[in-house]
Design a protein with these regions (language model features):
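Glycine-rich phosphate-binding loops of nucleotide-dependent enzymes
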Residues: 1-173
């Protein structure tokens, strides 16, 4: 991996309050291209809250976020995804009753036009998800296999596959 001085993500003086509870206070963080960064701390220290702020799930009460040097206001996780930032949630956020391929594309499914209607393109979902799983060397029976049939490690791998399937610049876990 090649490391550079290019800062992909910078958080400046991030604070998050839930009523009278201070979950984060003046957190500063920067992540450079090619860098792997771990955030550690005690239970209740605010690690998950910080990750949810960075991924657009929570709006910071104070502070600023910069992506590739540009100040950004994240209104939703879709905003962070559009900037190339993806998150693998602690609970993995997988739908056990859906196949692997549909979990990878959940919310971003390729469609095909059928007159006035759009329908999910299941063939494309399967082809693209199998190609991505192969690229990541994730071995499963089929992209049609339901997530609930997978082991815990395989589920984690599928969550990572989803986070990396859409040209992410930064993956938060």
């Amino acid at each position: 991996m090649i490391y550079s001085n290019k800062v992909i993500l910078e958080a400046k003086n991030i604070s998050k309050y839930f009523g009278t509870i201070t979950a984060l206070e003046n957190v500063n963080l920067s992540v450079r291209e090619g860098e792997c960064l771990g955030v550690v701390g005690d239970n209740g220290a605010g690690k998950t809250t910080l990750m949810k702020v960075l991924s657009g799930l929570y709006k910071p009460s104070k502070g600023e976020l910069y992506f590739n040097g540009n100040k950004e206001v994240l209104e939703s996780p879709r905003d962070s995804q559009n900037l190339g930032l993806e998150m693998v949630y602690q609970d993995l956020a997988l739908a056990g009753n859906l196949p692997i391929g549909e979990n990878i594309f959940l919310g971003r499914e390729p469609t095909k036009n059928l007159g006035f209607f759009k329908m999910l393109d299941y063939k494309k979902i399967k082809e693209m998800s199998e190609a991505h799983l192969e690229k990541l060397k994730i071995h499963v029976k089929s992209a049609d296999q339901k997530v609930e049939e997978l082991s815990g490690g395989q589920r984690q791998a599928i969550a990572i596959a989803r986070a990396t399937a859409f040209n992410s610049n930064l993956v938060i876990m």
